[in-house]
């Protein structure tokens, strides 16, 4: 007999935000119920909040559509941000010199699971 799948995953790859900044937002929702996590994200004034919110909504939709899980029973079991490719640029400086600019990207991953009551 096939094992019942009780979690769903969503990820956004190569998002143009520094991983260090995105992790601040992701740390707020880890372990929370999806309703509470969405509320937290809507009132968090950080650039990463809408990105993480979109990934969370995608994970919830994946759970409902692909695995027939009830969204009321879901919580954020895993949420992490990995470093993506870095875009390297240069800023011209005085005396013909240049300073490097690293435009960092992130891979945002959110996994939602059913609560075992």
From Swiss-Prot:
Is Ribosomal protein found in the keyword set? yes
Stored Pfam families: Ribosomal_L22
Q: Could you tell me the keywords of this UniProt record?
A: Ribonucleoprotein, Ribosomal protein, RNA-binding, rRNA-binding
Q: Which CDD domains match?
A: Ribosomal_L22
Question: Quaternary structure per UniProt?
Answer: Part of the 50S ribosomal subunit.
Q: Which GO terms describe its biological process?
A: translation
Please give the NCBIfam families that the UniProt record associates with this protein.
rplV_bact
Q: What InterPro entries does the record point to? A: Ribosomal_uL22 (IPR001063), Ribosomal_uL22_bac/chlpt-type (IPR005727), Ribosomal_uL22_bac/org-type (IPR047867), Ribosomal_uL22_sf (IPR036394)
Similarity field: Belongs to the universal ribosomal protein uL22 family.
- Biological role stated in the UniProt entry: This protein binds specifically to 23S rRNA; its binding is stimulated by other ribosomal proteins, e.g. L4, L17, and L20. It is important during the early stages of 50S assembly. It makes multiple contacts with different domains of the 23S rRNA in the assembled 50S subunit and ribosome. The globular domain of the protein is located near the polypeptide exit tunnel on the outside of the subunit, while an extended beta-hairpin is found that lines the wall of the exit tunnel in the center of the 70S ribosome.
Instruction: Return the protein name.
Output: Large ribosomal subunit protein uL22
Quote the PANTHER family the UniProt record gives: CHLOROPLAST 50S RIBOSOMAL PROTEIN L22-RELATED, LARGE RIBOSOMAL SUBUNIT PROTEIN UL22M
The gene behind this protein is rplV
A single Gene Ontology MF term assigned here is: rRNA binding
């Amino acid at each position: 007999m096939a094992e019942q799948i009780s979690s769903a995953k969503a990820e956004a790859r190569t998002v143009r935000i520094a991983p260090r900044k995105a992790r601040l937002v992701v740390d707020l929702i880890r372990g929370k119920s999806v309703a509470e996590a969405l509320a937290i994200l809507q009132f968090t004034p950080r650039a990463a909040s809408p990105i993480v919110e979109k990934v969370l909504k995608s994970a919830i939709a994946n759970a409902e559509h692909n695995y027939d899980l009830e969204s009321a029973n879901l919580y954020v079991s895993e949420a992490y941000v990995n470093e993506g490719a870095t875009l390297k640029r240069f800023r011209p400086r005085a005396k013909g010199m240049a300073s490097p600019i690293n435009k960092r990207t992130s891979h945002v991953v959110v996994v939602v699971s059913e609560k075992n009551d």
